[in-house]
UniProtKB/Swiss-Prot annotation:
Keywords assigned by UniProt, alphabetized: Cell cycle, Cell division, Cell shape, Coiled coil, Cytoplasm
Coiled-coil regions, chain positions: 42-77
Name of the molecule in the record: Cell cycle protein GpsB
Annotated localization: Cytoplasm
Stretches the record annotates as Disordered: 74-96
Entries under Pfam families matching the protein: DivIVA (PF05103)
Length: 112
């Protein structure tokens, strides 16, 4: 995921001073109000960027956990029929729990 770098921070915008000239210029109040709007937008953008990074990391973690659970299910096949019949109910229960967890993780990761 590429990080969105902003050239200016809200503080940079707030502290920016413009050179005053004798010639006619913009109304100071109008410029200040506009810069206040820009500062608010920059703060929202920074918050959203932080949230995207956090969600991306969580998504990666959940995908990794999902893959590990899939491998566990795939490798938890019975070794022989005797062992399978004696542990059938506990294995079935364990597999159902694992499959439910995989299903929940898929919903969380893929939004299905």
């Amino acid at each position: 995921m590429s990080d969105v770098s902003l050239k200016l921070s809200a503080k940079d915008i707030y502290e920016k001073d413009f050179e005053k000239t004798m010639a006619r210029g913009y109304r100071r109040e109008e410029v200040d109000a506009f810069l206040d709007d820009i500062i608010t937008d920059y703060q929202k953008m920074a918050d959203m960027n932080n949230e995207v990074v956090k969600l991306s990391e969580e998504n990666h973690k959940l995908k990794k956990e999902l893959e590990e659970l899939r491998l566990r299910v795939a490798t938890s096949r019975p070794q022989d029929n005797k062992n399978f019949s004696s542990n059938n109910s506990s294995s079935a229960s364990n597999n159902v729990d694992i499959l439910k967890r995989i299903s929940n993780l898929e919903k969380a990761v893929f939004g299905k």
